[in-house]
Amino acid sequence: MTARWVVDEVAAERDLRITWQPISLLFKNEMTEADEPYPRYLKTHKMLRVMESVRAAVGDAPVGDLYWEYGRRVHHDQDKDFDVADALTAVGLDAVHAAAFEDEAWDAPIRERMAVGIELAGEDIGTPIIGFHDRNGDRRAFFGPVITRVPSPDDSLDMWDSLMTLMNIDGFWELKRTRTERPDFGERP
């Protein structure tokens, strides 16, 4: 949801350049096969391997297209067992990258890219992480925002500008409140 908010409502209005980075909750939460959510986290982790294969072969730009296709299938179609090769071809990418799904060699680049976000945002966070350059040009990142729907265009920009203001204040660290509703993904894009 946060990705949809930033890409659809904020990026063009605030001249943002989006580079998709992986975060594996399997690695972040140090999951083992004994953990109940392990199969779900393993599946999404393997999807990240495919994304890193794509990035290595053709650069950052198509990674976003694949991310959206994954999201359409998982969140809108409720298909958590889709064929990754089908998702690749749906966005014009070579299905050969599907082999990365089972290839543990892609775990190293996932860990390396995750480490950058975690170093900037902190260890006690999850996903999403938004990284940016502050008003002094220093790299910063924060966890969130966690939202259940994409705000209106005006509210989206207000929220972004408010977050950027807060994140530029030294000594500011955290806001939180209990979530009381489930995400509303809207129509399938």
Model-flagged regions — what are they?
Residues 1-84, 162-163, 174, 186:
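Structural alpha/beta surface segment adjacent to cysteine/selenocysteine redox centers
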Residues 6-11, 81-189:
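C-terminal cap of thioredoxin/glutaredoxin-like
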